[in-house]
UniProtKB/Swiss-Prot annotation:
Family (UniProt): Belongs to the FPG family.
Catalytic activity of the protein: Hydrolysis of DNA containing ring-opened 7-methylguanine residues, releasing 2,6-diamino-4-hydroxy-5-(N-methyl)formamidopyrimidine; 2'-deoxyribonucleotide-(2'-deoxyribose 5'-phosphate)-2'-deoxyribonucleotide-DNA = a 3'-end 2'-deoxyribonucleotide-(2,3-dehydro-2,3-deoxyribose 5'-phosphate)-DNA + a 5'-end 5'-phospho-2'-deoxyribonucleoside-DNA + H(+)
Official protein name in the record: Formamidopyrimidine-DNA glycosylase
Function: Involved in base excision repair of DNA damaged by oxidation or by mutagenic agents. Acts as a DNA glycosylase that recognizes and removes damaged bases. Has a preference for oxidized purines, such as 7,8-dihydro-8-oxoguanine (8-oxoG). Has AP (apurinic/apyrimidinic) lyase activity and introduces nicks in the DNA strand. Cleaves the DNA backbone by beta-delta elimination to generate a single-strand break at the site of the removed base with both 3'- and 5'-phosphates.
Binding positions (DNA): 91, 109
PANTHER family assigned: FORMAMIDOPYRIMIDINE-DNA GLYCOSYLASE
A molecular function (GO) term: zinc ion binding
Subunit structure: Monomer.
SMART domains: Fapy_DNA_glyco, H2TH
A biological process term (GO) from this entry: base-excision repair
Record has Lyase as a keyword: yes
Length: 271
């Protein structure tokens, strides 16, 4: 699933290409995504100017004068700018057309979202209750220590709880915990403030490194310019079960936490 880095890369990639332009057409080839694409979306938006593109958690917000289109890439989606006359593939479900170019949603598993919200998109129910952005100033060790006080849930699950912290999905949670030398099964409330401060720094470091590398392309992800990411080549633990730890050569282990595969080094990340 595209996580925060992939969505941020998409946002940065498409923003300069479409922001400020007028929507000339909107084509929905298959409205059956996780929720149906609104049937009147074209009627609402064609002729309107796209004022800006921003990210909140794993959502993209396409801001128009009277509201926002919310886009979620689901498990396998990508959003990129193509020539408007480029033939659509079987998994290309939605085009927002700006003259000679189109912003095209490709979603093989159709688990993404394209929704309309009148007014500020941040007030949409899917976004209003989300937690802190890990790349913003409010995400600190002191805040995380307070937010996890008394929490018995594992630190891995806590990092992936979008009501606390957004965008740190399965891949980057495993990678961040390795960099911080924290065992993924450690109860969040039992981790001291110094180690949590180190974890906050590791989360930021991991996410920024992934953004610099164009994100992770394990299957379908490409950025707004159509390029694949290569951060997967830098993974310390994710997907490396049985392979030697890049730091100490101990075999990397896999454990299922909250129904998600989690990877760690038993030597570098002692309980």
């Amino acid at each position: 699933m595209p996580e925060l880095p992939e969505v941020e890369i998409t946002c940065r990639g498409i923003r300069p290409l479409v922001a400020g332009r007028t929507l000339t057409a909107l084509e929905v080839r298959n409205p059956r995504l996780r929720q149906p694409v609104p049937a009147d979306l074209a009627q609402t938006l064609v002729g309107e100017r796209l004022q800006g593109v921003r990210r909140r958690a794993k959502y993209l917000l396409l801001d128009f004068p009277h509201g926002s289109v919310l886009v979620h890439l689901g498990m396998s989606g990508s959003l990129r700018v193509v020539s408007a006359d480029e033939p659509a593939g079987v998994h290309d479900h939605v085009d927002l057309v700006f003259g000679a170019e189109a912003l095209r949603l490709r979603d093989p598993r159709r688990f993404g979202l394209v929704l309309w919200h009148a007014g500020d998109g941040l007030s949409h129910p899917l976004l209003a209750a989300l937690g802190r952005e890990p790349l913003e100033r409010g995400f600190t060790g002191a805040w995380l220590h307070e937010a996890t006080r008394g929490v018995r849930l594992s630190i891995k699950q806590t990092l992936m709880d979008a009501h606390r912290v957004v965008g740190v999905g399965n891949i980057y949670a495993s990678e961040s915990l390795f960099r911080a030398r924290i065992h993924p099964l450690a109860p969040a409330g039992a981790i001291g403030p110094q180690r949590l401060a180190r974890l906050v720094a590791s989360v930021r470091e991991t996410l920024l490194a992934a953004i610099d590398a164009g994100g992770s392309t394990l299957r379908d992800f490409v950025g707004g310019d159509g390029r694949a990411g290569y951060f997967q080549q830098q993974y310390f633990v994710y997907g490396r079960e049985g392979l030697a730890c890049r730091v100490c050569a101990t075999p990397v282990r896999r454990v299922v936490i909250g129904q998600r595969s989690t990877f760690f080094c038993p030597r570098c990340q002692r309980r």
